[in-house]
């Protein structure tokens, strides 16, 4: 990894009515990181989100959960990245992923938005730069395109949620490896993991 990660963003929608919905998987990951590394997240209107700072393997990392709605996530990410002069290549964005089953999570750098409105807005607000890293947290697919909105905005059944939580825990552990500057090792660990019921 040439550029060390300086900012980790967890995507979701604000408010208690969305807190436990599948679309907030990215936000759960950042909250888990804050907890594991004894950080705290606080509302920061300047960056339109909850922000915090932690240290992972001696490296200083900023955390951000945008409090804008999902399709406006770029506003928050760019505000913070611009202020601290963090290039896209040093940003990791965690998000829910329809194309992976619950219990699976994968790191990736660059690529399109795959129809994800949060990623779409971030790419757009970064001036069409898609070179940031992603953590894709599998939530599964409802089967048809028409069902997607209702699916991501509802809670997963208990058994599915357990799989998502297990993959989240593994992603947090793999993040530790990521900060030894070994993306390949972190990917190998996370990509070989699949939670089972």
Curated annotation (Swiss-Prot):
GO terms for molecular function: peptidyl-tRNA hydrolase activity; tRNA binding. GO terms for biological process: protein quality control for misfolded or incompletely synthesized proteins; rescue of stalled ribosome. Keywords: Cytoplasm, Hydrolase, RNA-binding, tRNA-binding. The record marks 96 as: Stabilizes the basic form of H active site to accept a proton. The record marks 13 as: Discriminates between blocked and unblocked aminoacyl-tRNA. It holds the Pfam family Pept_tRNA_hydro. The active site is at 23 (proton acceptor). It comes from the Bacteria. InterPro entries: Pept_tRNA_hydro, Pept_tRNA_hydro_CS, Pept_tRNA_hydro_sf. Its EC number is 3.1.1.29. It is found in: Cytoplasm. One of its GO terms (cellular component) is cytoplasm. It catalyses: an N-acyl-L-alpha-aminoacyl-tRNA + H2O = an N-acyl-L-amino acid + a tRNA + H(+). TRNA binds at residues 18, 69, 71, 117. PROSITE patterns: PEPT_TRNA_HYDROL_2. Belongs to the PTH family. Hydrolyzes ribosome-free peptidyl-tRNAs (with 1 or more amino acids incorporated), which drop off the ribosome during protein synthesis, or as a result of ribosome stalling. This is Peptidyl-tRNA hydrolase. The lineage of its organism: Bacteria, Pseudomonadati, Pseudomonadota, Gammaproteobacteria, Aeromonadales. The gene is pth.
């Amino acid at each position: 990894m040439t550029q060390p990660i300086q900012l980790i963003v967890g995507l979701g929608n604000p408010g208690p009515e969305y807190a436990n919905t599948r679309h907030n998987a990215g936000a759960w990951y950042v909250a888990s990181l804050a907890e594991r590394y004894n950080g705290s997240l606080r509302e920061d209107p300047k960056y339109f989100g909850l922000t915090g700072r932690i240290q992972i393997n001696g490296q200083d990392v900023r955390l951000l959960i945008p409090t804008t709605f999902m399709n406006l996530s770029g506003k928050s990410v760019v505000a913070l990245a611009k202020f601290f002069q963090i290039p896209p290549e040093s940003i990791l964005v965690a998000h829910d992923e329809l194309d992976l089953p619950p219990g699976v999570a994968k790191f990736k750098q660059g690529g399109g938005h795959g129809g994800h409105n949060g990623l779409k807005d971030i790419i757009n607000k970064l001036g069409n730069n898609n070179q940031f890293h992603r953590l894709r947290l599998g939530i599964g697919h409802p089967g048809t395109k028409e069902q997607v909105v209702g699916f991501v905005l509802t809670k997963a059944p208990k058994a599915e949620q357990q799989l998502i939580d297990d993959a989240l825990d593994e992603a947090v552990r793999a993040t530790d490896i990521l900060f030894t500057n070994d993306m390949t090792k972190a990917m190998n660990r996370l990509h070989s993991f699949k939670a089972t019921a």
